[in-house]
Amino acid sequence: MKLEQLLEGVSYTLVQGSLELDIEDIIYDSRKAAPGRLFVCIVGTQRDSHDYAAQCVADGVTALVVQHDIDLSTVPGAAVLKVESSRYALALMSGNLFGNPSRRMTMIGVTGTKGKTTTTHMIKSVLEAAGRKVGMIGTNGIYFLGHHQETANTTPESYELQKTFREFLDAGCDTALMEVSSQGLMMDRVAGIHYDIGVFTHLSPDHIGPGEHKTFEEYRSWKGQLFKRCTTGVVNIDDENTEALLEGHTCKLVTYGCSEKADYRAGTYQLLRTHDFLGVQFHVSGKDDMDVKVNMPGEFSVYNALAALTVGKVLGLPDEAIHEGLGRCVVKGRVELVPISRKFTILLDYAHNEVSTESLLTTLRAYDPHRLVVVFGCGGNRSKLRRYGMGEICAKMADFSILTEDNNRFEKVEDIIADIRMGMNKGNPDAKFVEIPDRLDALHYAVDHAQEGDLIAVIGKGHETYRDREGVKTPFLERELLEEYAQQIGLE
């Protein structure tokens, strides 16, 4: 592709060289420098890649995009283009390089502090029940037409994002569905993308601190940017931050919630539980009239399902597809049941801090189990406050806890458990718990000592497939390990 074509839509100044160059690829990692490539110099939080421009040119890079002045004598022969924001330019050029695939698919973006992952999976399930071919990007990875691959970020860098959209399109997808993080919006990873539907789930203080957002107001403002980049906004009208988040929105709004003012509203919900089902059932009224059954527990599942249902209605999908899609949706590592016994219920969840743990245990307690049992640990080389907090919450809310490892990294598991124990003692000096450092042994213990009617939550890892000890990651798939052990001991 000619450099001039690659720059379509980008505001730039040609500082040096020609626009008639042929560009084979775009890079923003100097280690990938090679002839025929364009290097985008980005100012990061840790380093400024403008410092690597000269070496990239020496390694054959044909053109440079810069955000501030560089010494032109160090980059002879290369085209140099100056832009106001390198990240923004990278996003637009990446779209051009891959033929702007997002313009040829239905685009759906989901944002919020909690609920993004589950809601995107629910939307995907509804769309597929209606016959749509869907590509999905989010916390759990990239999914399309039977393929799955991991991602480093909830919202990948713009180049990877556009490349993935191209893969979706080439594979025959007609819809791209993605989680849109505040970082993805702030860092221009989704610049140049217009969404047909933007979805807002929920907002609470998170991602506030160095390298993220300075204040909650800034965090909320960036979330709200999605609703200046979409045609229709599907929003949770019950959230206290909705009005402020939508300030300056340019899209049509369709609302969901439990309040009377919602376009699609849920009535009183009923909790449903068997050994292999933990969910809710509720009636939807307002602009529709239908019963919904969801294979996920708690009030938050009602809201997530309402969001998916509303997206389906905006797209004109039949009620049968919406009902079927919501009923069969399962999200890996999010209240994921492992049906290995009729005697008790065991599930996996990614809850890994005190807020998500308290939310999960509150939800599970509502199902009135014989005992609420929690298997958990905390990550090594991470905040000790999380250990105290999770210990305190579990001591207060669980009937029995099994303290174990969770990616120790370079810390001793005994030290981590000691910190958790301090939180347990603070939360409830009479809390019942046992310490089993090896997580596999802890899983076996939970199964061996399960009582009739117990609800066992194995939390912290969720969708993760590894165990990290001393920086070495080895396979650790909790669902498979539980199923293998149940078969080994002949569990019924």
Which stretches of residues belong to each language-model region?
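ATP-dependent carboxylate-amine ligase
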Residues: 1-14, 35-38, 250, 287, ...
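N-terminal leader/targeting and accessory segments in enzymes
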Residues: 1-92, 228, 269, 293, ...
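Acidic, Mg2+-coordinating active-site environments of NTP-dependent enzymes
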Residues: 7-9, 70-77, 171, 196-346, ...
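Phosphate-binding loop of NTP-binding sites
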Residues: 7-10, 89-233, 237, 241-249, ...
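Short glycine-rich anion-binding loops that position phosphate/pyrophosphate groups of nucleotides
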Residues: 44-46, 182-183, 204-207, 239-240, ...
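Non-catalytic positions within long, well-ordered alpha-helices that form the structural scaffold/packing
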Residues: 53-58, 169, 191, 365
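Short internal beta-strands
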Residues: 58, 62-68, 233-237, 375-376, ...
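Structural beta-sheet core signal
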Residues: 136, 178, 198, 235, ...
